[in-house]
Amino acid sequence: MYQRILLASDGSALSRKAEHAAIDLASSLGAKLVALHVVPRYPVSYYEGSVTFSTREVARIEDASAARAQRAVDAVVDAATALGVGAKGVVVRSDLVADSILGAARKHRCDLIVMASHGRRGLKRVLLGSETQHVLTHGKTPVLVLR
């Protein structure tokens, strides 16, 4: 059925649920797993005329976020490998999270995307996050959405 599964995770509690489901699915199908974490770029200023950060501070924050993301995908790879699933972790830095997910699915020739219904930015009362909605409406790859 599916041979290569892309797991899109942001480290949220709901994404961790998707991680477990993706690993279990890959294991049951004999599929490979690509664990992806997209790290959004950090703005120099959040509000016009308010707090600004130096480019050095922004780089430090982005590097720390990327390091956390790498540890997260490494943990997914380790968990998958322990179950005999071939897996690799990918960290991408981009403000275009959904487009990065779709691009990674194409690049790694994935035939299924697994992701949570919403992540860190989603309010609990929101049924479907904007990134998930974008992936569903703009991609050609089937998507398994977990909540």
What are these regions (language model features)?
Residues T55-R71:
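A short acidic, glycine-rich active-site loop
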Residues L112-T137:
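Glycine-rich, Arg-bearing micro-motifs that act as flexible, cationic patches
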Residues S50-S54, A105-H108, E131-T132:
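Short, hinge-like loop/turn segments at secondary-structure boundaries
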Residues M1-T55, A79-K88:
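Small/aliphatic-rich secondary-structure junction motif
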Residues T141-L146:
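Short, flexible loop segments at boundaries between secondary-structure elements
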Residues M1, A75-I113:
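Structural beta-alpha unit
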Residues H37, A116-H118, R147:
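Short secondary-structure boundary segments
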